[in-house]
Amino acid sequence: AGMTPIDNSVRVRQMFGSPEYPETDDYVREQVKKEHDRARNIKGYFRQMAAARSAPNRKNMLKKIVAPTLIIHGEDDQLVNVNGGKETKKHVRHAKFVTFKGMGHNMPRELLKKFLTLISQNIAEGENFDSTK
């Protein structure tokens, strides 16, 4: 028998996951099934991918962002090169760029507390933020 859509999603997720934080196929399958149960729209996914590929350069739009911005990127992301995150930071005035060695294109459970700390700090900075500076 051929691969099911869930089997294929597990395979793709594992391919782009974090080399330093491997996840079992069973765990990834559980996550994929939860998404599937939330009625993930596959046509919407493909529209999003097409829009991202055909979108114009965003540099000028990024320069308009004045809020404190947190960019988290995996140093081992095989889907979106880390240089894309570095480039984004250059164009967002109040951006903080944080990378994680060994992280791919996912959010490893082992790093969730660090993510939450960074996000909480960014929110706190935003509460007292003066966009005129």
What does each model-found stretch correspond to?
Residues 94-133:
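Catalytic active-site module of serine/aspartate enzymes centered on a nucleophile-bearing elbow/loop
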Residues 65, 71-73, 77:
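Short beta-strand/loop motif that positions the catalytic acidic residue
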Residues 1-60, 67:
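Alpha/beta-hydrolase
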Residues 63-66, 91-92:
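Short, conserved loop/helix-junction motifs that constitute active-site signature segments
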Residues 9-13, 89, 120:
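Non-transmembrane alpha-helical segments in soluble domains
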Residues 78-84:
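Conserved alpha/beta-hydrolase "acid-adjacent" motif
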